[in-house]
Amino acid sequence: NVEIGTPSTTVTWTVPTAIDASAVTTVSSHNPGQSFITGTTTTVVYTATDEFGNIGQCAFTITVTATDSIDPVVTVSSGFITQQVEIGLGGVNVFYTEPTATDNSGTAVLFSRSAQPGDFFPVGQTVVTYIFQDPSGNFGTGTFTVNVVEVDTTPPVVTVPNGIITRQVEIGTSGIIVFFSEPTATDNSGTAILDSRTHQPGDVFPVGQTIVTYTFRDPAGNPATGTFTINVVEVDTTPPVITVPTPSIITRQVEVGTPGVSVFYQEPTATDNSGTAILVSRTNQPGDVFPVGQTVVTYTFQDPSGNPASATVTINVVEVDTTPPVISVPSTFITRTVELGTPGVNVFYPEPTASDNSGTAILVTRTNQPGDFFSVGQTVVTYTFQDPTGNPATATVTINIVEEDTTPPTVNCINDVIRTVELGTTSAQVFYSEPTASDVGQATLISRTAQPGDSFPVGATVVTYIFGDNAGNIADPCVFTITVNTVDTTPPTVNCVSDVVRVVELGTTSLAVVYTEPTATDISGTASLV
């Protein structure tokens, strides 16, 4: 017997002996120490021959058998698995990587296990055993320990008597001593100890909000925090301070006979030691209509503590002549045309006039006058009139000098285009460089009867391009011809015949043979035998 997987082995044995009255010669098919293949049976034959040719034989078999005596090898990923549970739960479902096994036979099957992943394991240590078996019945065992430990991960529960405690102090006071009920804590362990606190009852707290933090811990070291706010508020008894913009008397003029006017002004503002002063009332506001004479406007402010303060602004409306002259412009836009390239022209036009409620309106300035030379483009002419009170009025006249374009575009036409296609083709897609045009202004393609990439039929097609400019001038048409010619480049198609075989009498040297001649077709309709 040999271990499974051993391909062969050497075998020894006691050599048979032969006894005879005369000398004996012995030969054998195999010899001790030879290698024999596993899984085979071999017959060994010994033959003994004496001097007279008498023969005696001895035969036996050698059988080499493979056997498996090696246990499977078990691999345990972790020999000790620890899982924590909260105190009082008793145990926990544990998932783990199961052991595996290998065997020299190539197969190791799980035979039994004392637990499996996902089972409930109690607090303490549990030994888990896995047994594997190979096809020969050899067993391999692997064990590991699941250790379930009770731990305390629950923090204490903190109780805060008040989330916010408010105390008042006189404005300008920096702070105050505050007494309060301290937070308490409970824990599932039965003990929660105060670990730290940022403040304690009787401390001085400054004006504003102070967050007080209490931290408790249980015997397992789990922390828990409770916070509350000490709010120290300043009390304000000082009214706001009002600032009235200078001047406090605001004067506006209105035209004589006008009952009043809408007046816009800068409003009073207020500051307060609290930082906030709110406008609570005003008898008027910017943009209101104020009558001729003096109107006292009262503004009242209040701080967050309700302290009021008032101030006044006087609006003084005075009648005056503020109406400017009324200008009449015969024509606000005057257009003259000049030939293209002419720099400008002298223009005569009717001048604006003016009237005023005082009866007098005098022309004081004008930037141009009739008969002046005006350049191509637009020139704004400004006229200014004034009444005896000095009220001015202005009007404008625009002189527009326009160049006229009467020259049509210059067209760069192209030569006729010739393309060839295969005989039988009815049309062809033709690409070509398009005609162009230039102009003193802007040349535009108005129309075209075809364009590059169009399909053109066999024969001649006349193509026309027409260009114009932005002045409406039309150039002579650009006319060229696109010719599509057909050519035949495809050879005829020959319908050949099969080889011809005829039989003649032995000794005959020739024979007249009749056969069907080959034929041919062509896309032109004619194929000639040459």
UniProtKB/Swiss-Prot annotation:
GO terms for cellular component: extracellular region. The keyword Repeat applies. PROSITE patterns: HYR (PS50825). Coiled coil: none annotated. One of its GO terms (biological process) is cell adhesion. Glycosylated. Pfam families: HYR. Homooligomer in presence of calcium. This is Hyalin. It comes from Lytechinus variegatus. The lineage of its organism: Eukaryota, Metazoa, Echinodermata, Eleutherozoa, Echinozoa.
